[in-house]
Amino acid sequence: MLLSFRRNRRSQFNHIIHGFLPAASIAPKPAVPRTPPPRSPNPSPERPRSALAAAILATTLTGQTVAIPQPRQRSRSESDASDIEKDSFIKPYATTSELRLRQSWQNEPRRTSLPSFEMLGYGEDEDAETQVSTSCRESESTWKDVGDGRDATYTVPHRDQVLPSQKLVRKDDAPQPDWLSDSSSSSSSSTPQHTQQKDVKHSVLNLEGEKVRLHEKPPPSPDVAGRIHQRYTEITKEKFAELKEETVHLYSANQALSCELSALRQAMKDLQLKLKLVEKDNRKLKETEKASCQEGVTPELLCLRKQSQDLVDENEGLKMIVHRLNVELSRYQTKFRPLSEEESSHIQGLPSKGPTPPWLVDIKYLSPLLLAYEDRMKEKDKLSTALEEEMKTFRLRVQEVVKENEALHQELTKRSPVTVEEWRQLQTQAELVLDENKLLIEQLEIQQAKARDTHQAHLQDVSKLTKQLVLLEAKTQGQEKQLVESTEQLESLQAKCTELKAQLDSKIAVDVHTSIVNELKSQLQKEEEKDSAEMEELMAKLTALQVQKKSLLLEKSSWATRNRALEAELERTRKANRRYQKRIDVLRKQVEKAMGKEMSAHQYLANLVGLAETVTKERDSLKYLAQCLESEKHGVLNKILKGNIRLGKLEERVKGYKKQAALKLGDIHHRLKEQQEDFAGKAAQYQKEVKHLHRMLQEKQEVLDEALQQKRNMEGELEMVLESTAKENRRMRSLLQATLERRSTQHVTAPPDTCLRRSSQGDLLIGHDFSYGDVQLLATTNRQSLGESMA
């Protein structure tokens, strides 16, 4: 059945997404308006509202039927609110609540209606009068959704090596502590897990108990359905936050992998340095072998070689000393200001003549600079050792966290399996929300255009009326000026008359004078009467204009208040749309970041594969070099054995590192393959579901259009029937009144048989009286049956 909208009541549910609004709510209103009865703002449970009495009173006064509203539940208590908060507690890594499956969508005989503007919040003052059947079905479906919402899929960052067919499934009531914040405290995470499990079990029991109560009790009011939808939206918000946490966790895992890669690269560099040292040792051994092979070696040559070697060592030592001194001097120069030319000229530095001073030759004089340099090197060594210890502790903590993660995943595997339908349904709902948002934005734009047009028309009317007022005021002022001028003319005429009287006293006779005076008096009286009549007319016009002005001012104030209310509603809707747009943009950015991180991980893997290939090539070359060296090392057995032992150890280490790198690469390849397969499957399923939902929406829209057309046809037919019945009723009454008047004029005293006839005619009149309310009741029953067939 179609949802009609209530108005002038502020909604309590301000957190439900407006995208759940169906297309039926956007349909045009019926031709005959239905006004609901007045309601008290705070109804008490001891004094229920008599909606039936209010409906009867409204029908008797207006002659129109009214849909009787549902009885509202009393406000929730603190215990109910606490139960709802417990029910809405969801553990991390839960993707979406379990909604209906596609089979249930196809097999359902009736689709439940979505919430109206009363449940959607937004601060819009609109109510919805839902019928009993729709509210019952809506409450049952919502309880089913909440009951199934206990099961949810999990995205696991540290996944074990499992075949794609053997995918792990998780349960929603498994404990998930804060892995990012409390990574070091593994022992303290057991107690909150117990409490979270108890809360979830308690919420599940509450849900089951309320389900049983729903079957026992009569269907709930729209407030219960609104509360359920509010809880559902809170669950979806929590799950969006959990998705954000998952992205953060994946980012940290990628960082850990990058750290491991850098550590592997450092280890490879160390191995390369060690190999270079081994090559140098081998070269020295070759040189010693060549020297031993030479037969004509004299002790003088050996002494010369020793001296040359000593000189080389001394030269290298002096170079190192010069380097250290340069470093220390550069630091000193950066710390202190350089000397000016005048100051440097007064300083007695190197002597121009004579031998070199001893402090330039002897190393003892340079000891303070060397000591300072060595102190700085020791400080750096201490810092490096401290950082190494911190890295070791950090590695231990990371290993503990990984162990905890694996233990938790093992516990999750022991739980019951869950389907993967929640994530699909959430994304389809998000797409539907976007479509509904677009439709609502278009409607808002249309309403804004209509409001602007009405405002402009109102302003034009006001401007016209003000112009008329200005013109009338100008007319009144002109007439007042004319009156003043006429009075002045009268005064001048009176003065002239007096002068003429004075002049004509001696000339004119008394009879002539009296006749002239009488004529003048009659003229004056006529003029005064005309002036008084004109003044009365002008005063009446002024009063009428003042009344019109007051009424126009009242209308202007009412229109201004309406415009303000409409502007406030528009601002609220704009703010809500901005909020949801910002949330959508943030989620898009997070998805783009996750995709970028995946691409960087792919690049890292490619680099690792290249490094592994280079390592294998170097290993082959090293093996070849080792074989060559073994063939050349028969002379000096002890040194060759030591070198072979070192090479064996290094090869074992290299093999161990290579095995570790190969294992890690295999794990990463396996995880990436699983993720790609999951993403491909999910994308295909999402596309199928989107197509299915589009088909369902088109079918429902067609059904709604047909039902609206039938409703309009029925209303037109009912109006025609009502008009015809009213005409017949009037005609019958006029005929009966005419016959009664004729009989009363013919016979003043009627016999008993005429009385009987009159009584029978009156009974017939009463029996055949046709009431307008009966026809309207029939119309309402027809509308209700039509609405139920549509639902």
Swiss-Prot record:
Biased composition, class Polar residues, residue ranges: 94-107
Cellular-component GO terms for this entry: centriole; centrosome; ciliary basal body; ciliary transition fiber; cytosol; mitochondrial intermembrane space; motile cilium; non-motile cilium
Residue pairs linked by disulfide bridges in the UniProt entry: none
Region (Disordered): 27-203
InterPro entries for the chain: CEP89 (IPR033545)
Keywords, ordered alphabetically: Cilium biogenesis/degradation, Coiled coil, Cytoplasm, Cytoskeleton, Mitochondrion, Phosphoprotein
Coiled coil ranges: 252-291, 370-598, 670-737
Keyword Cytoplasm on entry: yes
Residue spans of biased composition, Low complexity class: 50-62, 181-190
Compositional bias segments (type: Basic and acidic residues): 75-89, 137-161
Subcellular location: Cytoplasm, Cytosol; Cytoplasm, Cytoskeleton, Microtubule organizing center, Centrosome; Cytoplasm, Cytoskeleton, Spindle pole; Cytoplasm, Cytoskeleton, Microtubule organizing center, Centrosome, Centriole
GO BP, one annotated term: chemical synaptic transmission
General function of this protein: Required for ciliogenesis. Also plays a role in mitochondrial metabolism where it may modulate complex IV activity.
Name the record gives this protein: Centrosomal protein of 89 kDa
